[in-house]
């Protein structure tokens, strides 16, 4: 019988600065060549468990350990020793780069081992080809897209022929199409190298796009389930801990189709439905289509637009490339609109132009009918709240309370009102128990929620959020989005830049689709998410509802997608 490559026995860990353990009584065996998904909500202990595997715990982040952990049959002795077994790809790939070029970054570990240059070049090229990164070895890592950066990071750890590849939230910063390619790449690496793959991620459905042996579900530092995908996707434990079930599972459940392990529901392409069950889905979609036939997709155009972008163009001086070309659209009070498209499509550049971080080269941006060209950044900030994609680029105070209070204090708000506002917004963002914590103690996803709180606490008329749910588990995702919905119902215009097609489908009535600096489409969200041609052009990915419609022989997949978009299927 094969011995475990990784084995936790009655393992618990407590950070020295914390009162209670972060991990409790972990008993887990992982065998050579397995592909494992570790899933759980924010704060469940996923990242801490990963840090135990790569040696950051206890050698960098010290604490109290009980029980045992062996890797390769040995007790970890140092980070250096573990690096021979475990290669880690961080969630924030920028924090991992050390070389001036991508090739130099991949070669870093070999340089430290004084590897002969000819051998080094050959090995760098081989591993770059393995991950599909051989076309940009001379490029600076900082100039690459999110997906390209991830490939360079993978190559940098695979070059040491490690037995274990550990990936911390590999999908967090990727557009849907690139995320799909990342999962395919990880699957390809597993097949070609035979290494053990451990993925830490809460986006269950996206990871299960390709084969996974087991899913380890964590909550409050404990393993609550260790199951195969066919069992985990229908487990009530997902609802209990706050992890989203796959969209097609939720749809089938609401329609009244009984999904069991025997139907092989772990992946949509393995799902086995009877003819009667497929007919049930078709009849439901038809009924939902009839019920919504009189509904209008028009948004309110009876008032002056709150924000109007007119023929806007922008070129980055250092590259002389057109980041945006002839962009025009209107936003009306109370709209909730998504901006979608590939990495590098111009979505974030547009947001920077609206808030004044960059100046338009052509065209104009109007707020309530008035050109904002002469407004300063602080003046624009009084009208439009902005939440960046990377929280580390926004946070400037060491303590959470002071960080969220900063915008209020510079505006002269009284301390009692500051306390009241902060308590309310931290509660909504799921951060109330961290009120007096230092920022440094938070996870990446928790920092993201702090920056959303920074914007929400000022009660702006427009909120622009760049990837508002990146790094969030389903429970916090839902809390944040429902809070945005409540603001939206009060007339606050919400503009969301997102890669999350579930978010677009569930919360956006309208979607602006960008590709290569152009606005390809301005349509209802359900139309965008049921148009494979448009999805391919913009590096999007149709939701699993589209594929479910195809499996059930629904002629017009939009009927099922629209039903979900309009609330016919519960989230």
Give residue ranges: language-model regions.
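Helix-to-loop junction immediately C-terminal to a conserved catalytic motif
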Residues: 54, 355
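Conserved ABC transporter NBD signature motif
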Residues: 62-77, 363-371, 380
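ABC ATPase NBD coupling module
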Residues: 74-87, 372-385
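Conserved ABC ATPase "signature" region
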Residues: 118-136, 405, 416-434
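Conserved ABC ATPase signature
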Residues: 140-144, 148, 438-442
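Catalytic Walker B motif of ABC-type/P-loop ATPase nucleotide-binding domains
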Residues: 165-168, 463-466
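Conserved beta-strand-loop-alpha-helix hinge in the C-terminal portion
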Residues: 222-248, 518-545
